[in-house]
Amino acid sequence: LNIELEAGRAFGSGSHESTAGCLFSLLHLFKIISPKRVMDLGCGSGILSIASVKLWPLAKTLALDIDYDAVKTTLENIKVNKVWRQIRCKHSNGFPRARPGTSKKYDLIVANILAKPLVALAPHSSNFLRSGGHIVLSGLLRTQEREILAVYNSLGFRLVSRKRLKEWTTFILKYKRT
């Protein structure tokens, strides 16, 4: 994937193991799915949003971050990579507020954030992910794997793939509505 990137003050140059794990996971998913709607939760520099639309040019991606600098950096990187038609970027403290009557779900959610927010956001994940959809979780240490898997398994998610790079782990999980 050819991505021009200025990380600025935002996380996500591609060199950190958690970001690299997400990129490996997107390449793995590229072989088996073709999502129409993607959410990048904690977009940082926008690298994962940009990678998703380079892999799936017809996909629409929503990039969200709690940090205003990250949103600004993502918007700049979207322009540099000429993918502004496919990616919307917004400031958000977690998942976006669902508008009444909106039932559009995502086929793929990527969340490269830390374990604690991944646990806190877990119960809301199924509200935004369609049954049969995938979620990529990263930003967690090997020592946190069991806790994260237990929480997501209890909500109907099943492990598809685990990628370990040094002490960092990235999961691909598939959601099945029960």
Describe the function of each predicted region.
Residues 2-7:
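A short, charged helix-loop
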Residues 1, 35-37, 133:
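Nucleotide donor/acceptor-binding cores
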Residues 9-94:
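Conserved SAM/SAH cofactor-binding pocket of Class I
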Residues 59, 66-177:
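S-adenosylmethionine
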